Amino acid sequence: MARIAFLDYLAALAPAENEQAVQDLARFIGAKSSIGSDVGRHMNSTVLNGKVISGGNTCLVIENVSKVDKALYYGFASHYLDFDDAQANLAGHFSTVLYSALLAVLEPTDTWNEFFRAYIIGAELEGIIGYLINPAHRTQGWHSTGTVGVIGAAAAIGALRGLHGESLAQLLSLAATQSAGMFFQSGTDGKPLHAGLAARNGVWAYELLQHTSLQTSTNPFDPERGWFKTIGNITVTSNDIASRWLAPGQLIDPGLWMKVHPYCSAAICGAEAAEIVVHRLYTSSSYVSKHNYLSPDTEEQDQCRLCTTPDFSLWDEINRVTVHFPPGADAALRYTSPTTGREGQFSIEYIVYQVLAYGSVQDELFKIDAIDTDVRDCMSRIERVYDLPKVSQTERITKVTVTLKNGDTFTETVNNPKGSPKNPLTMEDIRIKLGLTLEADQIDRVIEAFTHTDEVESFLQTLRKEGVLHV
């Protein structure tokens, strides 16, 4: 699981490197690192470590990007499109922070086994902490990708670099005191910045303790006055963590949610339910008769028509749409009437609207600056209700009901959509995600290098040759 999670992490990071905000952050990092560099050699590009990045009006040649800045960039970029994995206990995102921190501190001799062992340790700690503090932590408005992620990053770095005892305790302590991230940033660039800051602060804590004589508390999780008591007003003992450690493992149970589209994972069940409803409605006898076309013989033919017919939209037929959740299950979907595509990534209304208008989610619509009034009018016909039974923190279920103007009703319930732990992405799905940035032959070379290199740095060199990892 750790291996496919790393490829998925790269598949989320790579397309984000073409986004303006990500390139702007690269230029900001470049400005810090380019004193004495040849600025302006490529007037329409940024150059980092000798690699040209398209876009912009200036050139910043960075010869030595600090580990701290690498972590910031990787974390921000890999979470920017909200295309990265999520985990239910954490109620946040593992890989964006952990892999970003680990890549930043990587040494040329680090092996895959060491790299993935460190990731698993960081993920395990984050998942257990999430289990202990959620759902209260989430409902209070914290973004655990930031608040817990920095602790996981420190744990992963400590594992990779072989820290233990007092040294590890001080590293975790310095990370814990930097815990931050609030969910009001969702739908803005502030949310992916949480991931970048968590990775950066984990690396910074490690660097500070390695290169100075500073001393910190060695008991950051003291049951009476430590992190858990301060953040969540709960008492947690070392046994509460030890008794759950790798039993069976947070990557196994509850596992990871991975995405085929760049929007909040809380909407995945609803999106797939809407797609099933669309297919059922489109192939219904009443719809076929009314619109005077032959019903497709296969699902492939159906999907082909949905994706290629400009006037496919069902909205002229629809009276109302109801999205059914268990109580509180839509907390992360904070926008009921989004005004931008970015906000729409956290709106079940916008996502269901797309499916009913186009037959499937349209990724490019999450990049628009302003959502049209007619789209918002359609979204006003979508309502949320909370009439499904309450489920555990690790479960998700959503029902979508579409009522037509003629009174016909279509409904579907989904609890294990594509990308969920019980219906995981395959390697072919990961190749498709990589294909958003790379050509088929490039993907082949990346997978070949990933499979046959012993040291992580050798693989990263292949990635950079193929145009991934601009820092």
What are the roles of these predicted feature ranges?
Residues 1-91, 190, 194-200, 207, ...:
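Terminal-appendage/accessory-domain detector
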Residues 3, 7, 98, 116-119, ...:
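Hydrophobic face of alpha-helices
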Residues 67, 92-96, 116, 120:
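Alpha-helix N-cap/helix-start motif at coil-to-helix transitions, marked by capping-box chemistry
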Residues 72-111, 125:
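Function-dense linear segments that define catalytic or interfacial modules
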Residues 95-96, 146-151, 426-430:
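Short acidic alpha-helix initiation/capping motifs at coil-to-helix transition points
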Residues 98-105, 122-126, 150-158, 202-209, ...:
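Buried hydrophobic packing segments
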Residues 107-204, 216-224:
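Glycine-rich, mobile lid/loop segments that gate access to catalytic sites or pores
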